[in-house]
Amino acid sequence: MSESVHTNTSLWSKGMKAVIVAQFLSAFGDNALLFATLALLKAQFYPEWSQPILQMVFVGAYILFAPFVGQVADSFAKGRVMMFANGLKLLGAASICFGINPFLGYTLVGVGAAAYSPAKYGILGELTTGSKLVKANGLMEASTIAAILLGSVAGGVLADWHILVALAACALAYGGAVVANIYIPKLAAARPGQSWNLISMTRSFLNACTSLWRNGETRFSLVGTSLFWGAGVTLRFLLVLWVPVALGITDNATPTYLNAMVAIGIVVGAGAAAKLVTLETVSRCMPAGILIGVVVLIFSLQHELLPAYALLMLIGVLGGFFVVPLNALLQERGKKSVGAGNAIAVQNLGENSAMLLMLGIYSLAVMVGIPVVPIGIGFGALFALAITALWIWQRRH
């Protein structure tokens, strides 16, 4: 059955506004919860190497449910899927508030996030299309990064004041996202009537993976976004250990302020990409990807706060300019071949596999005692080389 698409000529339709608000609140909760839970781990004297494990159980949920969440997004009204997923996040955050093991509660939030992601991006192609899709992605990324900016800072600052207050604020944000989802129009399911046999769903997902991987443009997008988000998540945890070593600051708030600089930069970069890059000129974003690694390397050598702020903002600008066109390319090509929901689910599998791999290597490096500054230098150099290799491969094919 072909995918039905519902579009609106206005980029600021009622439905689009509801999606952006819901995304902001949901992402605010995600980022505040991460830093609030990290503060909880520190307060309960968990070892340093366990910090990235928290994110690994989160992304593990993405990987485990990857064969199924794309079909869920395409089989039901995407706004309702988003509401259900935010309800799961609310339950996970509340469980941590009430003393449940933080790794278990955070895993439940990860399950909600896994269900949420294909729906939140897939719905953009139903509310708008064509040239407005890149701009809609820019709005989505800007909303997400604004939420990362405010959520990260709120999580760290509130945790320095009282950890339980920080956790409760996360639960309230998820509750607000559930309410915002109610105002998203109930669009027709994109691909109703598909089989719910788990074996068939897994086979269908693997077929979608194969289809997207065989297409040069979507393979290029999948690899690029996977490298970017894997590196981005690893950088967040690198900052938590880098700040006390390089700057001599031991509070919970400073790493969140530094993460906020990345967030501000990504908003700027996403806006620039929406104006300067189209689906036909996606390769313009590649030099920015290479420079991300170079700037991370330079950043790792800093010992003063102001240069660190400036370099992290530059990393964000480069990151926003790099990732927004790649997201739009995958959605547009994927919608026509395997369905937007399935395309985003495959993208999530790639991105979260990269996160799991990079976080695992980072956690292992910390566990065996490699100093955080050499870890940062190696991380930046390897990322720059990886994006360079991807660009060379893309130009040849």
Swiss-Prot record:
The record's listing under SUPFAM superfamilies reads: MFS general substrate transporter (SSF103473)
Segments in the Periplasmic topological domain: 1-17, 74-90, 166, 248-256, 302-304, 365-366
* TM stretches of this protein: 18-38, 53-73, 91-111, 145-165, 167-187, 227-247, 257-277, 281-301, 305-325, 344-364, 367-387
What spans does the record annotate as topological domain Cytoplasmic, numbered to this chain?
A: 39-52, 112-144, 188-226, 278-280, 326-343, 388-397
Signal peptide range? none
Q: Name one GO cellular component term.
A: plasma membrane
| Keyword flag Transmembrane helix | yes
Q: Which terms are listed as keywords in the entry?
A: Cell inner membrane, Cell membrane, Lipid transport, Membrane, Transmembrane, Transmembrane helix, Transport
Q: Name one GO molecular function term.
A: lysophospholipid:sodium symporter activity
Where does this one sit in the cell? Answer: Cell inner membrane
- Family annotation (InterPro entries): LysoPLipid__transptr_LplT, MFS, MFS_trans_sf
Q: What is the name listed in the Swiss-Prot or TrEMBL entry for this protein?
A: Lysophospholipid transporter LplT
What is the scientific name of the source organism? Answer: Escherichia coli O6:H1 (strain CFT073 / ATCC 700928 / UPEC)
